[in-house]
């Protein structure tokens, strides 16, 4: 890890902070993305992506897309997640790791923050605005941000982002400077259940299981026929199906 890279901000638990009476509205609410965290900066004239642990990642299409922006902003560090709506988390990680993976250009960078070492006390609302100039850049997404002024508004934001296929909501302090490490300046909030199911059918990209009431459902991912897998979902609907199911792991993974 180089001197240019900071420790990424990490999220506290929203429900725990709410139970302590530690919330201070308003906040920004943003989608919780199930991707790979990265910090991005310009190093010796080249755009470099670093993992959360400081390892360099090679995604040339993203480096090229960010070169004009970061060249004009020396020292700036972008904070976001590598993510693809069309790849499972396992396939996403494989595409990121492999130098020649055919799915590599399916990976986009979802940005939600930045850090300017020349303005270490800069409020989040201003850091977020600094990302606007990246709107419309290929392979780059600036996450949607909603202003929430109550817990009820947080619940509505959670439903909104889950409805878009995300796994939850991130709650950000509007006025806080960038906090390295874990702090309540950023909180995560999601409502999901985990259950085990037997795989009854498979194809190249999906697996199929049955709910306890006998309703079939399919999710993206790969597993063996008859294998027991862990599925994460929001709730069981009145007709017995799962809302927003997602493959988490198989027993082989454990």
Q: What do these predicted regions represent?
A:
Residues 17-138, 253:
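Covalent nucleotidyltransferase
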Residues 1-23:
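Phosphate/adenylate-binding "loop-and-lid" substructures adjacent to NTP/NAD/dNTP-binding pockets
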Residues 3, 145-193:
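Amphipathic alpha-helical
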Residues 7, 27, 78, 168-172:
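A short, Trp-centered hydrophobic/proline-enriched beta-strand micro-motif
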Residues 30, 36-80, 181-254:
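Classical nucleotidyltransferase
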């Amino acid at each position: 890890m180089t001197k240019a890279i900071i420790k990424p901000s990490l999220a506290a638990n929203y429900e725990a902070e709410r139970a302590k009476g530690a919330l201070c509205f308003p906040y920004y609410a943003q989608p919780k993305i199930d991707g790979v965290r990265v910090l991005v900066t310009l190093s010796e004239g080249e755009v470099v992506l670093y993992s959360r642990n400081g390892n360099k990642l090679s995604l040339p299409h993203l480096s090229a897309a960010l070169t004009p922006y970061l060249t004009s902003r020396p020292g700036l560090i972008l904070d976001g997640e590598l993510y693809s709506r069309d790849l499972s988390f396992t396939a996403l990680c494989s595409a990121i790791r492999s130098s020649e993976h055919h799915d590599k250009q399916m990976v986009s960078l979802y940005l939600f923050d930045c850090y300017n070492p020349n303005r270490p006390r800069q409020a989040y609302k201003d850091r977020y605005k600094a990302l606007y100039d990246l709107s419309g850049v290929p392979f780059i997404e600036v996450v949607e941000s909603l202003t929430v002024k109550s817990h009820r508004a947080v619940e509505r934001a959670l439903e909104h982002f889950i409805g878009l296929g995300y796994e939850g909501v991130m709650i950000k302090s509007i006025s806080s400077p960038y906090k390295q490490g874990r702090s309540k300046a950023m909180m995560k909030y999601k409502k999901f259940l985990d259950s085990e199911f037997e795989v009854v059918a498979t194809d190249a990209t999906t697996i199929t299981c049955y709910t306890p009431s006998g309703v079939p459902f399919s999710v993206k991912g790969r597993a063996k026929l008859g294998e027991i897998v862990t599925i994460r979902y929001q709730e069981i609907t009145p007709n017995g199906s799962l809302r927003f199911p997602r493959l988490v792991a198989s027993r082989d993974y454990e």
